[in-house]
A protein has these predicted regions:
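A conserved mid-protein helix/loop that constitutes part of the nucleotide-sugar donor-binding site
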Residues: 4-9, 212-235, 241, 252-258
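Donor nucleotide-sugar binding/catalytic pocket of nucleotide-sugar-dependent glycosyltransferases
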Residues: 132-138, 142, 156-198
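A short, well-ordered alpha-helix in the C-terminal region of glycosyltransferases
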Residues: 269, 282, 339, 346, ...
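Aromatic "clamp/platform" in nucleotide-sugar-dependent glycosyltransferases that forms part
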Residues: 275, 294
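A short hydrophobic beta-strand element within the catalytic core of glycosyltransferases
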Residues: 289-290
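Short acidic/histidine- and often glycine-rich active-site loop of Leloir-type glycosyltransferases
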Residues: 304, 317-327, 331-332
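Short hydrophobic beta-strand element within catalytic cores of glycosyltransferases
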Residues: 311-314
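Conserved acidic donor-binding segment of nucleotide-sugar-dependent glycosyltransferases
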Residues: 326-327, 331-337, 346-351
Length: 387
């Protein structure tokens, strides 16, 4: 996912002559594990990788491996995750169970960084002994459905809480009045040189289609609005537009989305490519990049599409304008199937518009590796650099 990719990019830039870094994962799984720099000391995970599997797969495997208590934890967490409430309520209920099954580190640290909302922040605050505690939230706190009443006690014990855009910082200020001084913006770090090198590989779309290609990179979840994308694709197909829409990613709604695509008659029009460790050749080869999310923080996939100078369409989620200046370097459209369809139809029909957006994006340098200095300042208890 985007957060994991952001973390790996951050770790790849760290000054290991200056810092010793331990990496604590909840479970050893993920597409980017092999990209963690060798200088990082990878601690044993809090749970086996199987813990993250679907409960029907996880339970028998954990029991066979001799982890009855972890199997019990996984079962209880499943029930907690299915109860009513917004995401923040569920994360908190899950942590109230998991905290009894996870160990605390033996040593004390100069600083701990919890790189994600929910359990990582709860763990860092509750279990880790450190002189400075820093949290990250990679989205719009309110739009994500997090619960300020539940999180307030944890936020109070952080020395800094970072997020990825000014809009996201404003959401934190609204959720936690009076906490402005500890809320900081550290943008997702982009290395354009690395991306362009990776993009030189071939893009295997798995077909011989020669028409316009639309690409989306997203977790297959409700947040990403892919159900809206499929309805938009149906409208465009009915109107006679020739295109293929490729989706890179996996997630909890994969089966439902594939069934929806089949029922809408889109089995050949929409192609699910699954997980791809290197999405950059696909970005280079696509004609349009579309992000149809219901909410985002500052989408890493959109940042990457900007670096690759692809014409971009975004739905009007709360932070969309933090990334795209609509009509100047992309389109921001209503968060409806009709809005998405009309925007994509404009891009498909107007080559000059696509070229204008590509030229505007190509004129900018999105590399921002200097953002890491902001984190260094927080780690060392120094004043946060002015932007």
């Amino acid at each position: 996912g985007g957060i994991e990719k952001s973390l790996v990019t951050l770790l790849s830039l760290f000054d290991y002559d200056r810092y010793e870094v331990d990496l604590q994962l909840f479970a050893d799984e993920g597409l980017f594990l092999d990209r963690v720099p060798e200088q990082v000391h990878h601690l044993p995970s809090l749970f086996p990788g199987e813990y993250r599997k679907n409960i029907r797969e996880a339970l028998p495997i954990l029991l066979r491996q001799g982890h009855p208590l972890i199997a019990l934890c996984r079962l209880l967490v499943t029930f907690a995750g299915k109860t009513r409430g917004e995401m923040g309520d569920r994360l908190y209920r899950m942590w109230r169970i998991e905290k009894h099954f996870v160990r605390a580190p033996k040593k004390e640290y100069d600083a701990v960084v919890a790189f994600m909302e929910g359990q990582p922040i709860y763990y860092a605050v509750s279990k880790v002994r450190a002189k400075r505690k820093i949290g990250f939230i990679h989205g719009d706190y309110g739009a994500m459905g997090l619960n300020a009443d539940l999180d307030r006690r944890y936020v109070a014990r952080l020395d800094a809480l970072c997020t990825v855009s000014e809009s996201c910082r404003a959401a934190l200020c609204k959720a936690f009045p009076g906490g402005d001084a500890k809320f900081h913006v550290i943008y997702n770090i982009i290395s354009a040189r690395f991306m362009r090198q990776m993009a030189e590989a071939s893009a295997d779309f798995g077909d011989s289609f020669t028409g316009p290609r639309i690409l989306t990179i997203a977790r297959l979840s409700h947040q990403k609005g892919l159900d809206l994308a499929l309805l938009a694709a149906m409208l465009m197909k009915k109107r006679g537009y020739a295109f293929r829409w490729y989706i890179i990613g996996v997630g909890p709604e994969e089966a439902d989305l594939k069934l929806q695509a089949k029922e809408l008659g889109l089995s050949e029009t929409v192609v699910f490519l699954g997980e791809r460790g290197n999405p950059y050749p696909f970005l280079r080869a696509c004609d349009i990049y579309a992000q149809t999310s219901r909410f985002e923080g500052k989408s890493i996939a959109v940042d990457e599409a900007m670096v690759m100078a692809r014409p971009i369409l975004l739905t009007d989620f709360s932070t969309a304008a933090d990334q795209i200046d609509s009509e100047k370097n992309g389109l921001i459209v209503p968060m409806t199937p009709e809005g998405i369809a009309e925007g994509l139809q404009r891009l498909l029909s107007d080559g000059a518009l696509r070229e204008r957006f590509t030229a505007a994006l190509s004129a900018c340098d999105y590399t921002n590796e200097g953002e890491i200095e902001k984190l260094y300042a927080l780690l060392e208890g120094k004043p946060f650099p002015a932007t």
